Amino acid sequence: MALLHHTQNAAQIKLRYRISSSAKPASCQANSFGTPTGLHQIADCIGATAPAGMVFKGRRATGRLASEYPLNEQASNLITSRILRLRGLELAHNAGQGCDSFERYIYIHGTNHEDRIGQPFSGGCIEMFNFDIIALFEIAQLGDLVYIFN
């Protein structure tokens, strides 16, 4: 994933991040578990004061770090550290009935499986190293644009 600085005449890559996207093929369809493609915007920024590794359920901090969960729960893909919730901006592609990224709860977030970053592993979200999502969260703003390529 690359963070671009866009000017009127050009775009320049400012930062690069290794990520994990869906284990399934890219897809904007509801219930596909694929990472949606196309133009999105950041619709919500969640977890500003949470410590690295904090687990979120239903977009709320649980009060427990991933390492504090029983091993059987750690085996699942936990949402950790920060959440940037995405809203699709392309009607009938990633916005609207049957394909809406916001309604699918598509996020950019930290993970308890950092060893799998760089491999397709998620259930549709974009997962990052916890340190990286915290750094990205510090510079991201509501309304910032995100373009997801296949």
Name the predicted role of every residue range.
Residues 16-32, 64-70, 130-131:
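N-terminal post-signal-peptidase region of extra-cytosolic proteins
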Residues 36-37, 142:
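Short, flexible surface segments
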Residues 7-9, 22-24, 45-47, 87-89, ...:
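Solvent-exposed coil/turn segments that connect beta secondary-structure elements
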Residues 18-20, 41, 85:
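Generic structural detector for well-ordered beta-strands
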Residues 1-25:
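A structural motif detector for short, solvent-exposed N-terminal "entry" segments of globular domains
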Residues 50-150:
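Exported/periplasmic cell-wall-interacting domains
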Residues 39-52:
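Short, well-structured hydrophobic secondary-structure segments
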Residues 13-17, 40, 104-106:
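Short beta-strand segments
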